Amino acid sequence: MFLYNLTLQRATGISFAIHGNFSGTKQQEIVVSRGKILELLRPDPNTGKVHTLLTVEVFGVIRSLMAFRLTGGTKDYIVVGSDSGRIVILEYQPSKNMFEKIHQETFGKSGCRRIVPGQFLAVDPKGRAVMISAIEKQKLVYILNRDAAARLTISSPLEAHKANTLVYHVVGVDVGFENPMFACLEMDYEEADNDPTGEAAANTQQTLTFYELDLGLNHVVRKYSEPLEEHGNFLITVPGGSDGPSGVLICSENYITYKNFGDQPDIRCPIPRRRNDLDDPERGMIFVCSATHKTKSMFFFLAQTEQGDIFKITLETDEDMVTEIRLKYFDTVPVAAAMCVLKTGFLFVASEFGNHYLYQIAHLGDDDEEPEFSSAMPLEEGDTFFFQPRPLKNLVLVDELDSLSPILFCQIADLANEDTPQLYVACGRGPRSSLRVLRHGLEVSETAVSELPGNPNAVWTVRRHIEDEFDAYIIVSFVNATLVLSIGETVEEVTDSGFLGTTPTLSCSLLGDDALVQVYPDGIRHIRADKRVNEWKTPGKKTIVKCAVNQRQVVIALTGGELVYFEMDPSGQLNEYTERKEMSADVVCMSLANVPPGEQRSRFLAVGLVDNTVRIISLDPSDCLQPLSMQALPAQPESLCIVEMGGTEKQDELGERGSIGFLYLNIGLQNGVLLRTVLDPVTGDLSDTRTRYLGSRPVKLFRVRMQGQEAVLAMSSRSWLSYSYQSRFHLTPLSYETLEFASGFASEQCPEGIVAISTNTLRILALEKLGAVFNQVAFPLQYTPRKFVIHPESNNLIIIETDHNAYTEATKAQRKQQMAEEMVEAAGEDERELAAEMAAAFLNENLPESIFGAPKAGSGQWASVIRVMNPIQGNTLDLVQLEQNEAAFSVAVCRFSNTGEDWYVLVGVAKDLILNPRSVAGGFVYTYKLVNNGEKLEFLHKTPVEEVPAAIAPFQGRVLIGVGKLLRVYDLGKKKLLRKCENKHIANYISGIQTIGHRVIVSDVQESFIWVRYKRNENQLIIFADDTYPRWVTTASLLDYDTVAGADKFGNICVVRLPPNTNDEVDEDPTGNKALRDRGLLNGASQKAEVIMNYHVGETVLSLQKTTLIPGGSESLVYTTLSGGIGILVPFTSHEDHDFFQHVEMHLRSEHPPLCGRDHLSFRSYYFPVKNVIDGDLCEQFNSMEPNKQKNVSEELDRTPPEVTKKLEDIRTRYAF
């Protein structure tokens, strides 16, 4: 079996975010890392929407990311620390829309190792040097400079190693133009390591160390080091030189401290805490991330605590000496992995879990009532400041980037009966968790819907003048009339536009600079800017059947297949070409391309005829109306559309932005198929046809604009958008009801919209999230969802949600009541009334936990609920709250053979589980009966067990439960579940159970798969085979009777198969006279499974399912990852295909090596050598290679570049999207 890996949705969790002017313009962009992906985002300063400019897979782990700019430069470069053992400097090239690798310097081994640098990066604020550090021992400094041609140069590395030293954080200190200096949080463990008593370990202190790079001596010195009182977790650089006092802020537990090199005294201030917080008061508070904003006259920091509260930190200075630190509560947003403050006044928050946000900073919070805390305020030792959290006041949310990270569980099923299955994804963490329903399609936002007096049959938009940015009129055609609407603040009917209103319209357009043309069945109406009208009437009894118009040309087809061609002359007159052309059959559809910039006319006309052909006809004056080429079609054409697509934007000498693309002829057929063929711009030949089935109705095509490029809207029983995005063609359905006719629409509120008609309504739509594969509906949950099952009869979901370090609702209410009583008791006689009021206000206050976070209860505290949910409406039908410290780990829905048709839900619960050091007071299996057609859970009984029941699976009318490392069969009893049989020989802990026939496949938490056979007659569970590798299995899926696919904690996927001669009729030989080796207790079972495939995904996979994703498609193995990625593994059906893709992969490995210097083959073989899998993500980078490299690779394969692209597209569309 050979598989091909494809990513459907890239990871959405963000681990790092940096900002800078990467494209060299004044506009700031954000570069984010999503594990093994680099992405460039640009927030639009006018609309506040975040657009993705570029996404690149780096096939390596991005461990650190920094932006830097050379002194006096205008462009920021990106330094990447990864697991490749190399430092890589990238530059964004806006003209090619790609990251270019400027430097790649090797310094160590590959992999994420303790002493190989790459974990921490620090840049001198003036861009003169960069320090790259490991977790332990090694630090390297590179000097950055320019050569004579102003290109970036990099020196050989200077070492600043110190053995037995752990590093916690590194930053560059802003010292102006003096020797660059770096500050590190370090800890020396040499004494602790050599001291057997453990005293030294308890006394080890963290130190703040300054390293100075002497530019004169080209050498790094350890300048100064001092021990710290508290344990710091990160450093913030304070602006220096002429901008500020220099130095660093150390964020540590409960305190923030300012330190500077020299005799400056330390200034420290406690981190304020929430008033009346339900958290454990003994728990320390730390800052987790920060952002700096610096202008010429001032600077401030925004730092976020682990509860999500942001504080604005300012420093008071007296002659460059810091005298106090001031903190002021700013706002609360979800806890971030990184924050960026942009010059345009935006705050980008890359959340640790869940969606990412872009906020507008509306106020700086200087003049509000919020109390300001200062290091100068007197406090008792151990006391702190208190503040009251509140909803957003200084920030305004302007955009939200959907993120599925972390996906904890996913099932694919068509519960909504839509033909195409939906993905039901349990994601998020704690109170920000959600169940999301993903459907393949683009999200459509409706900006306006208005009813029309009848059912129109067509709609167009036109501008008044060629220079206009926005459209002026919407023209709606009915069976016997035409309605003209003007576009302004509102849309109103106009009567003096010059259009003929008493007839239906076939087409209309802006002609020349400022004239309009209307084509109707009896003629052509040319309306000049001064409202003069010229008319051309059809001869005799003939009428116009079809037409095609653009800015300078009009072509009409009369009854009987006669073509008449008009072209505009320089004076603005429409002139008929002397000859007319008779076609051999009736004309069904026609299309003209837009006139290319700087040219007089479009050279080609495409005509579709009744005889199932499409013909290209020349409009060049030298051979006007002569046929150039023809293509036979499998069915009758319905509509045609010529567009220029796939171009990269370029600026010509005059600064005009044009794009160099290819001409494509899109052909919509009456049987619901869309064809896309390449139209040769010189000869007019048609080649390289791609086909896709869109739906059951004839396909109508419309040209629209998306992100400054032409795109095609195709309408069948569903509407689809064909567009080019990041050097790949996308054909994506719109998640919207059926439309009938459409046109591009541009107005101030909606610069790239679509106006469409559906029955008797006119709709204005916008598509914002281009490039998105799925649109999603999210239903909020209370705790982290762990697993869910689908009730087969009602299609309801039964979800178990469990959080560690959390309180149940009952405990929270109890704690609040207790605190309120304490408040009243603590008050004196005269303050009793006031205290009672405060206590009442405290009890009534309810800040949403999804923003303000849930109180942390401490380790060993668990909260769980069992939820029954309708997945289509998203409403909760039943909610069972478990008691404090009961944690639900497994769930199953099953029928028992002795109870008939009733459905039961079994939930495995652990009691008082402590994770480290591990201990558990036992567990229970709760049994519920599903009543009311699967909408309510009726509690039957709970069965005590001795360990955590981490896996439950229905089995032959009974149920299999993995209790710790015991595998048991239970049956339903009156008072509890009855144990029927057990097996004690599983190694560590059962994490999952799959069943097929008499076989049970058990996944062990660290010993891969174990095959067990249930013998009914002897009532025994007997192990008959296992795997040879230790795998830390997270999830598994059965592929057939002998084959299982599994994923492990380290990001690998494997497929394991039992050899054909495996015998599962083994005996546990009770007589004991068999050979010892057949008992196989020492090294597992006597029969071993074979590994069919191994593949390193690079992200922990938490769900696997064999399913089909598109109606009529083939089966594939779908996986979802912890970082929010969704991918599929598809089997090759022919040896030729496998051979072809193997060669594509081989050539791309050498021609297009990964961006961060990691070797592709060794990345995919991180833990196990990659076996029988071809990396489709690498193969698809063929599309973004430079044309000459594409040509080289395809010549090696004896193909042309379009043929290779077609193969890549075909394998994708056969299985997915």
Curated annotation (Swiss-Prot):
Localization annotation: Nucleus
Annotated GO MF terms: nucleic acid binding
Region (Interaction with SF3B1 and SF3B5): 193-231, 786-804
InterPro entries xrefs: Beta-prop_RSE1/DDB1/CPSF1_1st, Cleavage/polyA-sp_fac_asu_C, RSE1/DDB1/CFT1/CPSF1, WD40/YVTN_repeat-like_dom_sf, WD40_repeat_dom_sf
Residue numbers carrying Phosphothreonine: T1200
Role this protein plays: Component of the 17S U2 SnRNP complex of the spliceosome, a large ribonucleoprotein complex that removes introns from transcribed pre-mRNAs. The 17S U2 SnRNP complex (1) directly participates in early spliceosome assembly and (2) mediates recognition of the intron branch site during pre-mRNA splicing by promoting the selection of the pre-mRNA branch-site adenosine, the nucleophile for the first step of splicing.
Organism: Pongo abelii
Keywords: mRNA processing, mRNA splicing, Nucleus, Phosphoprotein, Spliceosome
Residue span of region Interaction with SF3B5: 1100-1123
Gene Ontology cellular component list: nucleus; U2-type precatalytic spliceosome; U2-type spliceosomal complex
Protein name, as recorded: Splicing factor 3B subunit 3
Lineage: Eukaryota, Metazoa, Chordata, Craniata, Vertebrata
Major localization class: nucleus
